[in-house]
Amino acid sequence: MTAPSQVLKIRRPDDWHLHLRDGDMLKTVVPYSSEIYARAIVMPNLAPPVTTVDAAIAYRQRILAAVPAGHNFTPLMTCYLTDSLDPDELERGFQQGVFTAAKLYPANATTNSSHGVTSTAAIMPVLERMEKIGMPLLVHGEVTHADIDIFDREARFIDTVMEPLRKQLPGLKVVFEHITTKDAADYVREGNDQLAATITPQHLMFNRNHMLVGGIRPHLYCLPILKRNVHQQALRELVASGFERVFLGTDSAPHARHRKEASCGCAGCFNAPTALGSYATVFEEMNALQHLEAFCSLNGPKFYGLPVNDSFIELERRESQVPDNIALNDDSLIPFLAGETIHWSVKK
């Protein structure tokens, strides 16, 4: 017998950390997000990065042009912080409603981050202006010194960058993005209402054993890298507790298959097609489905000072299979959980 399906109705969610890329990749991946999410914080790490108001407006138009008819989707644009960024340009974009937030990438921490910030001291006038105008700072929280082990880079960032910065600018709103460690979970939980975090589905579902034992799985390779089981469990416990300053941020980061399955493969999981069902699975496993809506749809708007969405979606508990690949010109994209059976899907 087939068990009766379970349906969860939740307010329409937002994705507070999303990579849409550009060109043909943009046109391919946008519908997977615009179908489900009402809004998304769009990352600015293009080549060249989005560092001006005009560049953000142009990129927003390219995104909107890729949204299928019938989808209601608002991209929330971000400014890529560099050592040479003009605080006046940043403020102009924020006051005009072009920039929702600004993104701090430590130089060379992740994809297309070579233009990133060399030190917070180098951009202190920009950060002081952000504190003054109430503009959120989104942080990729890893140090990038060559002598720091890749598994330690997030924890080290808290001690050497994040905590000193928040002490120096106590009024600055900070989102600690895609946290991956118990250290970060504890830090955010113990922080004040100026500090929040996003968590990806892959960091809730998997740890480094899943990526490395029995063969290397390049489609689980992302940055920050998957950590030990103890860190995965800390993240799961944080979201299952109903903690209000943590919210959905998929960090969906598409790369063509040949760039993932390579001798020097790219970091990033393309999880937009399966993320929401993945989150539901985790919350169900943790007996915390009562907190799923807040994580997906309420906590983010509250932190950003934005209204919650008026519309609703339904998640259905039924088994379905994730496609093995998604066509991309003469290549393909491998979605997160490709070929696997998933238990929650958005009801069409």
UniProtKB/Swiss-Prot annotation:
Domain of life: Bacteria
Residue(s) carrying N6-carboxylysine: 103
InterPro entries: Amidohydro-rel, DHOdimr, Dihydroorotase_CS, Metal_Hydrolase
Active site: 251
UniProt binding sites for substrate: 19-21, 45, 140, 223, 255, 267
Entry note: cofactor: Binds 2 Zn(2+) ions per subunit.
Amino acids binding Zn(2+) 2: 103, 140, 178
GO CC annotation terms, alphabetical: cytosol
GO MF annotations, alphabetized: dihydroorotase activity; zinc ion binding
Matching SUPFAM superfamilies: Metallo-dependent hydrolases (SSF51556)
Top-level EC class as recorded in UniProt: hydrolase
Record EC number: 3.5.2.3
Known catalytic reactions: (S)-dihydroorotate + H2O = N-carbamoyl-L-aspartate + H(+)
Keywords: Hydrolase, Metal-binding, Pyrimidine biosynthesis, Zinc
Pathway given in the UniProt record: Pyrimidine metabolism; UMP biosynthesis via de novo pathway; (S)-dihydroorotate from bicarbonate: step 3/3
Record's function text: Catalyzes the reversible cyclization of carbamoyl aspartate to dihydroorotate.
NCBIfam families reported in the protein's UniProt record: pyrC_dimer (TIGR00856)
Binding partners and assembly: Homodimer.
UniProt-recorded name of the protein: Dihydroorotase
Species in which this protein is naturally found: Escherichia fergusonii (strain ATCC 35469 / DSM 13698 / CCUG 18766 / IAM 14443 / JCM 21226 / LMG 7866 / NBRC 102419 / NCTC 12128 / CDC 0568-73)
Gene name for this UniProt entry: pyrC
